[in-house]
Curated annotation (Swiss-Prot):
Its main location: membrane. InterPro entries: MATE_fam (IPR002528), MATE_MdtK (IPR050222), MdtK-like (IPR048279). Pfam families: MatE. Signal peptide: none annotated. GO terms for cellular component: plasma membrane. Belongs to the multi antimicrobial extrusion (MATE) (TC 2.A.66.1) family. This is Multidrug resistance protein NorM. The gene is norM.
Length: 462
């Protein structure tokens, strides 16, 4: 087996232990790449904070607006990975260049609504009665970041879908790690005028992020096109309109799912804010901790997408079923261990964010530690649902999972959390139990759907 874990023939499906090893090998560089992206976001936040709360508020809100928009649109490009995996499994690698170039054109087209949305951030904020000065500064920030939209859709959206499917996930790893250093140097230099760079204040962070995103995209394109080992996957090929329709058909429900999940957490954060500064601070700490741990099952879900898709393409639904359920097991196992850490050492974790011995922090520390206990449960089902969603994408099954996610998050999760918070008197804890309930319902629906779909494929005459 190659480093990609995708070169076995359909006649020789792997054992369960080999499934686990290959999935972990594929997921590891993806997880580190995603953690590197989080590290860049943390760097931006810390350096913006050095300019004061106004700069931090404007830059942070502008960056969040940018990343929500491009992340949702990147969901459409997730279809590239399963299409490539299917083609490779079916020994139809001649289709891969067509998928790549069609995905490349799709990235360019998706950048258009991203640029439009980012250009409208100031009037949108004014429409929601945000302070005019804040709206103006956010508009200036996103006015720069809009030039990074295409780079992000290519360098993150397309490449993160394409490279793992051809066995080149490690390219993402090294480029992402390098991006941390480049981003930090450019951020500091452009914010404060260091290293001979112009002093741009808080807008320097937007310029630095834009440059880093484009450097990342160019580096990945160079590594992909410049290596003989992978060049045949991206040889000149004409994008195909029917293939464009196929990619959009698989990908748009994923984008909606990303949007539904993003709005759930956004609405929860806004609702926690009603409960006061202490509750909001505790919520942000717990959510940040959970977000770091989430990068691992997210990567496992991406690996499941590729591996399930490969074995479906190879005509072996039994191996595809095993690949999916082994990935689910890995995701649940990791998040269970992560949850155990949260239960055993909540105050030590909160101490990374706040001074535990400061009496002014006592209420926030207590609530944050309590939320981490809920997060221990929350994480397990969150990992299960994201891996299950990835496995279903490998089956090209995205529309029913989209409906399941919408129902689970907004039909169960938010209403339950709201009732527990304001009618049962649980406050922020109630909202977090609501999140856990919503994620648990989606996790069960995803796993059950994968079971039904693979059972049907196995039973079907071939």
């Amino acid at each position: 087996m190659s480093h990609s874990g995708l070169t076995r023939t359909a006649a020789a499906p792997p054992s369960l232990s080999r499934h686990a090893v290959d999935t972990a090998r594929l997921a590891a560089p993806l997880a580190i790449a995603q953690l590197s992206q989080m590290a860049m976001s943390v760097t931006d936040t810390v350096l913006l904070g050095s300019l004061g709360p106004d700069s931090l508020a404007a830059g942070g809100l502008g960056a969040n607006f940018f990343f929500v928009i491009v992340t949702v649109l990147q969901g459409v490009l997730s279809s590239v990975s399963v299409s490539v995996a299917h083609a490779r499994g079916a020994q139809a690698e001649h289709r891969v260049p067509h998928i790549y170039w069609t995905g490349f054109v799709l990235s360019v087209l998706l950048a258009i609504p991203a640029v439009v949305a980012l250009s409208l951030s100031e009037p949108l904020l004014l429409m929601f009665h945000e302070p005019p000065t804040l709206a103006q500064h956010v508009g200036e920030y996103t006015g720069i970041l809009r030039f990074a939209a295409l780079g992000s859709l290519i360098g993150v959206g397309l490449m993160r879908a394409f490279l793992p499917a051809i066995g080149a996930a490690r390219r993402l790893l090294w480029v992402s790690i390098g991006g941390i250093g480049v981003n930090a140097v450019l951020n500091y230099g452009l914010i404060h005028g260091a290293y001979g760079l112009p002093r741009l204040g808080f807008l320097g962070s937007a310029v630095a992020t834009t440059i880093t995103i484009w450097l990342t995209a160019f580096a990945l394109i160079w590594l992909l096109h410049g290596r003989a080992r992978f060049r045949h996957f991206v040889s000149a090929a004409r994008p195909k309109l029917p293939m464009m329709g196929e990619l959009i058909g698989i990908g748009w429900p994923v984008a909606i799912t990303y949007g539904v999940e993003s709005t759930l957490f956004l609405a929860t954060g806004l609702t926690v804010g009603v409960l006061g500064a202490t509750a909001l601070a505790a919520h942000q700490i717990a959510l940040n901790v959970a977000s770091v741990a989430f990068m691992v099952p997210l990567a496992i879900g991406q690996a499941a997408n590729v591996r399930v898709g490969y074995w479906i393409g190879a005509g072996d639904p039994v191996a595809a079923r095993h690949a999916g359920f082994v990935a689910l097991g890995l995701g649940v196992a990791f998040m269970s261990l992560s949850g155990l850490v949260l239960i055993l050492a909540p105050h030590a974790i909160v101490g990374l964010y706040l001074h535990l011995d400061d009496p002014a922090n006592a209420a926030t520390v207590s609530l944050a530690a309590s939320l981490l206990g809920i997060a221990a449960v929350f994480q397990i089902v969150d990992g299960m649902q994201t891996v299950g969603s990835g496995a279903l994408r490998g089956l090209r099954d995205t529309r029913i999972p989209m409906l399941a996610a919408t129902f689970g998050y907004w039909g169960i999760g938010f209403p339950t959390g709201y009732w527990l918070a304001f009618h049962a008197g649980l406050g922020a804890r109630g909202l977090w139990w609501g999140l856990a309930a919503g994620l648990a319902s989606v996790a069960v629906l995803m796993a059950w759907r994968f079971h039904l779909k693979t059972s049907s494929l196995i039973a079907a005459p071939r």
